[in-house]
């Protein structure tokens, strides 16, 4: 939930009547100033960055920004309470708080129903069977950061997504969209689907 997402929605998506899902972290929404937002990004979202290396544009949307997105027809998805690596959380109550209680708070504050969840960091090593079981009971759709299509599985508990960076070449984007890297992620998806069995 960076403020830049809100600006993209307002200046690009809304005029074209394109709707999007914005995944938000509860603790990040509640930060009141840009310096603290940069510190939060460095410690929770990009832990490999130092505070001074976090771009000045990496500060949070607030409740007003989120309400504006909802009023303009966009969807809010849950992205945990603190952006913790869920596989590191062994306590069930803490995991439940990260995934479910934080979502309940966002729903109440925005007067919406949240059906979508994206787990932090998006890779298999950042998720766990316990987290998946909690999320599966609470959400209709669970999004990963794993590349690939969602047509070749019967379960689809965890959805693949292709992220596109503005710096990617047309060749690289085309390669991803044609599925040339799907095999690399297939085992992770298979393993996560087996967590439900």
PLM feature spans:
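C-terminal active-site subregion of NodB/CE4 polysaccharide deacetylases
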Residues: 3-4, 15, 88-197
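Metal-dependent polysaccharide deacetylase catalytic core of the NodB/CE4 family, i.e.
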Residues: 3, 14-125, 156-159
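Active-site-adjacent structural elements in enzyme catalytic domains
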Residues: 11
């Amino acid at each position: 939930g960076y403020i830049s997402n809100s600006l993209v929605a307002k200046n690009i998506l809304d005029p074209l009547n394109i709707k999007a899902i914005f995944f938000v972290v509860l603790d990040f929404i509640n930060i009141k100033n840009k310096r603290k937002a940069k510190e939060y990004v460095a410690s929770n979202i990009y832990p490999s960055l130092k505070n001074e290396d976090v771009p000045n544009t990496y500060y949070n949307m607030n409740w007003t920004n989120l309400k504006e997105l909802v009023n303009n027809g966009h969807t809010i998805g849950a992205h945990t309470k603190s952006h913790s690596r869920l596989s590191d959380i062994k306590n069930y109550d803490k995991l439940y708080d990260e995934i479910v209680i934080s979502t309940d708070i966002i729903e109440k504050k925005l007067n919406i129903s949240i059906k979508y969840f994206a787990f932090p960091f998006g890779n298999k090593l950042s998720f766990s069977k316990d987290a998946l079981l909690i999320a599966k009971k609470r959400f209709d759709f669970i999004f990963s950061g794993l590349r690939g299509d969602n047509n070749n599985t019967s379960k689809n508990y965890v959805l693949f997504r292709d992220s596109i960076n503005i710096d990617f070449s047309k060749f690289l984007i085309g390669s991803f969209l044609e599925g040339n890297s799907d095999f690399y992620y297939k085992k992770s998806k298979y393993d996560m689907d087996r967590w439900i069995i």
